[in-house]
């Protein structure tokens, strides 16, 4: 009786080992396929996210550029009777940089004045 129990135990052990390895091989293949599919899916999702990120950055830079243009002030300019020339800021619109008799002879530089007609 003990011999039969030992023999059956041995038979069960051999069968379990044989079919266990077969299942383990199948499990390894399935695991490998799942991992490859997950990485492929993650890679594709990451590529789509990167593409979307690049599109958003392009839109953002265009909007920021428009806003910077809209909010930018006119550069500083000189008003009436203020020195102008190469070392000074330009005259404001409606004024021209001319040599005048009033201040120019003393300071040796042209001044922003209302343009003369003649």
From Swiss-Prot:
Record-linked Pfam families: Toxin_22 (PF08092)
UniProt keyword terms in alphabetical order: Disulfide bond, Ion channel impairing toxin, Knottin, Secreted, Signal, Toxin
UniProt subcellular location: Secreted
Domain of life: Eukaryota
GO molecular function: sodium channel inhibitor activity; toxin activity
Tissue expression: Expressed by the venom gland.
Signal peptide annotation: 1-16
GO-annotated cellular components: extracellular region
Main location: secreted
Removed propeptide positions: 17-76
Disulfide bridge partners, by residue number: 77-92, 84-97, 91-112
Family per record: Belongs to the neurotoxin 14 (magi-1) family. 06 (ICK-Trit) subfamily.
Domain statement: The presence of a 'disulfide through disulfide knot' structurally defines this protein as a knottin.
Function as written in the Swiss-Prot or TrEMBL entry: Ion channel inhibitor.
Protein name, UniProt field: U16-barytoxin-Tl1c
UniProt source species: Trittame loki (Brush-footed trapdoor spider)
The organism's taxonomic lineage, starting at the top: Eukaryota, Metazoa, Ecdysozoa, Arthropoda, Chelicerata
